[in-house]
């Protein structure tokens, strides 16, 4: 048992080292100075914080961008800032979010349309500071959520690089444990923070465990869930691809 645990730690260290090297390579090849990312207080952004700090100890910036966010999420984000000694800015986007809604046509009252403004405002803030400091914007999305389009187009999907983009949620959890991310952050229900008490799994209609099993094996025993996963994946292809461009026939 001890040998298995030690072997797993060695494997995880190799994975972490590969990701850190990849981040460095992407930033240097883009001729940028460092990295910037949004720190929500969730698991994925905590892992990204740890990886980025290891890649660029002196040129990493975290943006805490609450927008109707809970105090717990803000406190969790701050705990990561302190743990990894991150350079950061805490900018409350709630007032500008409400101001924007007040001048829009709100007669439709579409909750999702309103909620998606939040990650898009965060994207604007990230690229503003990225431009000032010459940093790349690092996304926090993982393979599981990307595969079913569980992200906001031109919001949290609007980034320069995705270190976790080919890593399943279950694998991100293992990396988080190896990096000694606080257990309360690892165990809290994943949430995009789009509205009060919103969780990823409730909104998707299935668990990350089911989704990861499907992505690993190509099928799961629960065919209703399998169909839902396939439907979400197919309907979100446009979110994962560049916009199609018209071509004249030759």
Q: Could you say what each language-model-derived stretch is?
A:
Residues 49, 74-75:
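Conserved strand-to-helix beginnings and helix N-cap segments that scaffold or border functional pockets
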Residues 120, 124:
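Catalytic-core regions of hydrolytic enzymes
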